[in-house]
UniProtKB/Swiss-Prot annotation:
Keywords: Chloroplast, Hydrolase, Plastid, Protease, Serine protease. HAMAP family: ClpP. It holds the Pfam family CLP_protease. It comes from Bigelowiella natans. Its EC number is 3.4.21.92. It catalyses: Hydrolysis of proteins to small peptides in the presence of ATP and magnesium. alpha-casein is the usual test substrate. In the absence of ATP, only oligopeptides shorter than five residues are hydrolyzed (such as succinyl-Leu-Tyr-|-NHMec, and Leu-Tyr-Leu-|-Tyr-Trp, in which cleavage of the -Tyr-|-Leu- and -Tyr-|-Trp bonds also occurs). The active site is at S101, H126. This is ATP-dependent Clp protease proteolytic subunit. Cleaves peptides in various proteins in a process that requires ATP hydrolysis. Has a chymotrypsin-like activity. Plays a major role in the degradation of misfolded proteins. The keyword Hydrolase applies. GO terms for biological process: protein quality control for misfolded or incompletely synthesized proteins. The keyword Aminoacyl-tRNA synthetase does not apply.
Length: 195
């Protein structure tokens, strides 16, 4: 039986009495955003809206981005990546379970020296995957798009993790699972949080 979204007491500085709010609203007030599900257009639009709003409230305060996601739509993830780079607020990223596929790129895109992972968390790198069907000409167009996205992802990874093009291209060719220590050595994160 699902328990629903937990509620917690929260009191705004202007309120006289605390109110019950869902946990995500409460954490959002502390500038914490969660990527905790499969990325699709709707969810990425919510995250982008939150990033833009938090940045408009204060460009000097950090935004905390907690990640526990198996990835999802590459284009949705790239739109979050672009928004992270567009805003002025520095973003702290923290992997609290798994950062697979496009969510690993979002993890790596946090502010250098402010990218974290928990000790037993994992990272998965791999090339873009798309379902392709239709006429031969449509399949060719889709295949070219997948290759273009692969080049874009490789370029974005090397900008964020200081690896060579050949190393990243080789590693994303097949599923590449990384432990927290391996993710740190690879340059996806800067620190492993132990307490």
């Amino acid at each position: 039986m699902p328990i629903g979204i937990p509620k917690v007491l929260f009191k705004e500085s202007t309120d006289t009495t605390p109110q019950w709010v869902d946990i995500y609203t409460r954490l959002y007030k502390d500038r914490i955003i969660f990527l905790f599900q499969l990325l699709d257009d709707d969810f990425s639009n919510q995250i982008i809206s939150m990033l833009l709003h938090l940045d408009s409230e204060s460009k000097e305060e950090l935004i905390y981005f907690y990640i526990n996601s198996v990835g999802g739509s590459v284009l949705s993830g790239i739109s979050i990546y672009d928004t992270m780079n567009f805003i002025n607020s520095e973003i702290v990223t923290l992997c609290i379970g798994i950062a697979s596929s496009i969510s690993s790129l979002i993890l790596a895109n946090g502010k250098r020296t402010k990218r974290f992972i928990l000790p037993h968390s994992r990272v998965l790198l791999h090339q873009p995957i798309m379902q392709v069907s239709g006429q031969a000409s449509d399949i060719l167009i889709e295949s070219e798009e997948i290759l273009r996205l692969r080049r874009i992802l490789t370029k974005i990874y090397i900008e964020n993790i200081d690896q060579t093009i050949s190393r990243v291209a080789r590693d994303i060719d097949r599923d590449c699972f990384l432990s927290s220590r391996e993710a740190k050595n690879y340059g996806i994160v800067d620190y492993i949080l132990t307490n």
